Amino acid sequence: ETFKTIISNRALLAIIGAAIVLLLSQFMGQTMNQYLFASYFKNINALSSLSMVGLPLSLGLATVSGVIASKFGKKEFSAFGMFLAAACYGIAYFMKLTNPWIFIGLYVLAGIGVTGFNMFIWAHITDVIDYNEVKFGERNDGVIYGVYSFSRKIGQALAGGLGGYALGFIGFNAAAQEQTTQVLD
C-alpha cells in the first residue's frame, strides 16, 4: 500500500527527479571542472578563483533567500534558479568558450541558480508531504523523507561515477601530456 502511494505521488517523483538532476549537475560539474581547467583552459589557478568566489556568494544568497522567496514564492524562486542555471550551462556549452574567466562568470551565475533551488528543496518536501495527505489521506512524513533521502544517495552515487564515465566517453587520457583535439572539442 505504501509503495503504491509512493509511485502514485507525482509531486514526490518530480522532486526526486529534480534532486537527482541537481546532484548530477553539482557533482559532475565539480569533477569535470578539474579536468576542464587543467587540460582545456590550461589555467588551474582559475579553478582556485572559482572555488573562492562560490562560497561567499552562497552565503550571501542564504542571507537574502528568505526575503526573496517571501516576496516571489519559494516555487517561483526555485524555478527561476534552475532556469538561470540551465541558461548559463547552455551558453557555456554552445559558445565553446576559450576564456576561463568568462566561463567562471557563467558558472558562478549557474551556481547561484542551483544554490537558490537547493536552499528550498527541503521546503518543497513538506509541500510533497502535504500533497500526499490531501491526495491519499495519509501523512507518511517518515516514508517520504526516507524515500527522498535515499534518492539523493542514489543521485550522489551516480554523480560520483558519471564524471569518470563522461571523461572516458570523450576519450580523456589521464596519462597523456596533451589531450587530443577530439577531447578538447
Segments (PLM) and residue ranges:
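Membrane-embedded alpha-helical bundles of multi-pass transporters/translocases
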Residues: 1-185
